[in-house]
Each structure stands twice: as structure tokens, then as C-alpha cells.
Amino acid sequence: MSEMTPREIVHELDSHIIGQQKAKRSVAIALRNRWRRMQLAADLRQEVTPKNILMIGPTGVGKTEIARRLARLAKAPFIKVEATKFTEVGYVGKEVEQIIRDLTDSAIKLTREEQIKKCKFRAEEAAEERILDALLPKPKEDWDSEKSDGSATRQIFRKKLREGQLDDKEIEIDVSAPQAGIEIMSPPGMEEMTNQLQSMFQNMGPGASKRRKMPIKEAYKLLIEEEASKLINQEDLKEQAIELVEQHGIVFLDEIDKICKRGESSGPDVSREGVQRDLLPLVEGCTVNTKHGMVKTDHILFIASGAFQMSKPSDLIPELQGRLPIRVELDALTAGDFKRILTEPHASLTEQYIALMGTEGVTIEFTEDGIDSIAEAAWQVNERTENIGARRLHTVMERLMEELSYEASDKSGSVTVIDAAYVKASLDNLVQDEDLSRYIL
């Protein structure tokens, strides 16, 4: 797991997300607390539960982006899910326990990658020997294997193989044949049963090998994977992955405001209040049965987020509100924020368009007043129509660059300066006309 300090986490998030310091600090503290908890004595560690977070803010201000970036920093099992995808147990749709099953699958993948790294050297050696055996088959006579391995010819070929001189040469090798996939049609909500049936049928088949002809470079990669998988103990892998989920797992619940109960609705609300009730045991702590084993959710961190434009946090059922003790409000974006978004983040929008046009040999230069005008145009459209936050910049930029993108292949070697006048000529009519803005921007 990540050992970054809160300050380092915020600094890393700053290079991708503008503003929203409160939200960044909250997730940074929550992530660091995971590390702090693991430094405690075992009996005290069991008592320290994560403080789940609820992020509240309008659409397009960075809630989901914080989750995406956090996933890369966490170095722990992480899953982002939409709360609207789930329904109450017994109805058509995904059950909330699928969240933990998916989280466990991601932990299995993470753990396998770590174990492959540890045994990569041994796997590379074994793969190298198999390729040399294919290149230099041993004579049928019962020669001493050590003498054969150390022969001058074998060492010459080993040197050439390591230097990449044999990469394009084709060889025939025996590789594990992929198990035939068995597709089982099942109704929504029955995914777990389907997975168990599929794994049962696949395990019934013998582990056959197949002879294939391929370049040495491709064969080497394939054999490394095959040899590494032989060195990994599958039972240990599952145990480590489950431990990783239970102690370090993070679940990001997006669009949680969409499962708030509507005041005017009547009858069962299977995709709203029912889902909230089903989420309660997960967030509070329960045991979920997965195909890899039983997973306890007591110490999994839940971060929920929602725009809450049509509802408010108090519309969530009280029990769920109590399980999300830390509330963070994200600020709406201003024209100044838009300007910073266009220039400051790593791989900003302006950098992306400069690089894209550069592939056609076209040079683009954004002036200071040009960027100001783009930011102002996006902010104005958000104020007059629906406020979709920073996503409006994508729409405005695409409209601004449309003509240039279309003609770029015919303008190789040209230089285009995007200043306030260029932006005004391209966008002014659309920004001023509210009806056009509604449909085009």
C-alpha cells in the first residue's frame, strides 16, 4: 500500500485537479490513516475503523477525477462503482455484494502481479532454457545434462538470445493451451452463480498443451508468464488477496444522490431506498461470500459522492448518513478556475490539442488573452444554461478547434495563433445566443 504522507498525496492530486483543497485533504488523511492503522498493535488495530467520506458538490467539479487519481496513488485494491447500477436483493439488477466480489477480483490481479515480479528472475531463466532447448535439441544419446548445458554452442546461443539477435527467428514450442471458455446465459443478479459454474466446468478439463510456431521474442514473453504462473501458489495468492481487501480495500460509490428516495413516489423503491438498506451492512461491516473465500468488510474504506442537485444528503436514510461521518463540500468552478484547468494540470487540454495538431505538422500557440476568452466563454455558457462544470471546457474547445482540426492535414508547416480575436470569431455567436448554446455547447 502507499506510504505517501497527506501533503505528498495532495501535491500529487494538485498536478491533475484544480482547487477543491478540502476534498483533497480529506481523502489524503483517509488514505494515510490506512497506513497509520497498520503500524498499531494487532488488538488496537482491530478496533480502529475507517471514517467513511461523503463528497458533495455540483457535477464536473472533480469528484470522480479525485477517485480516479486516488486509485493510482493507493497501491491497494480500489473499485469505483455507480450506485445507480444496483437494485434491492431479489429484484432484477446487480446486488450490492457484487461490489466486494469485484474488489476481491481486483485484489487477486494486484497480488498476482506482485508475485510475478518477485519470481520474474526465476521465470526468465526457465523460459530461456526452454527456448534454448527448442533451438538446440539434445541428442537422443543419454549425455550428461550438465555437460550439454555448459556446451560452447549453447552459451553462444544464450548470449545471442540475451542481446536480442534471435528475436525474429521462429521456433516451435509447447505452450499451455487456453481453456475453452464456457458461456452460460443467466438473468441479471445471478452473476456469482454463473461464475462458479464456469470455473467448475473449466477445472474439469485436462491441462493440455499445444505446439505453436512463433518468433522468439513473442515466445519468450509467453513462456515467462507460463513459468511464473507455475511458481505461484494459488492458495497463498487467494489468502494474501483477501487480507489485502480486508485491511486496505477502498470502494468509491459515485452518484449516491441518485438513490435518495423521492418524496412523491409510492410503493417499493427497489433501486433507491432498498439499495441504501442493502449498503448498510457492507458499510457497517459484514462477511461476503466470494469465489475466492469469505471477505470481511469491517475495515474497507467507503468514499461516496453525489451532486445532490435534486435531493440533499439528509434524504439518505439516517442509518447510512451515520455511516458516512466525514462530509466534504466541493466548490463550484469560476472563470479563474477554468483558466487554471486549461493551463496548469499535467497534460492539460491546451497541451493535448497542441500535441494532436503537432502530429499533422501544424503549430498552435495559445495566447494569454485567448485562454482568458475560452475560460470566460465556458463559464458564461454554464451560467446561462445547465452548469456541467469543467466538462463544458471539452465542448467549447472542440467547437473552437473544429475548423482547424478538419483542415490540419492540408496545412502542414503552418502556425496558428489562438488569441482573443480568434476565440471571439469562433464562439461569440454561439455564446451570446442562448438557444444555440443550449444545443451546440
Swiss-Prot record:
Keyword Flavoprotein attached: no
Matching CDD domains: RecA-like_HslU (cd19498)
Keywords: ATP-binding, Chaperone, Cytoplasm, Nucleotide-binding, Stress response
Keyword ATP-binding in annotation: yes
Intracellular or extracellular location(s): Cytoplasm
Domain of life of the organism encoding this protein: Bacteria
Disulfide bonds: none
Molecular function as annotated in GO: ATP binding; ATP hydrolysis activity; peptidase activity; proteasome-activating activity
Function, as annotated: ATPase subunit of a proteasome-like degradation complex; this subunit has chaperone activity. The binding of ATP and its subsequent hydrolysis by HslU are essential for unfolding of protein substrates subsequently hydrolyzed by HslV. HslU recognizes the N-terminal part of its protein substrates and unfolds these before they are guided to HslV for hydrolysis.
Family listed: Belongs to the ClpX chaperone family. HslU subfamily.
Protein name: ATP-dependent protease ATPase subunit HslU
Organism: Shewanella pealeana (strain ATCC 700345 / ANG-SQ1)
Gene name of the record: hslU
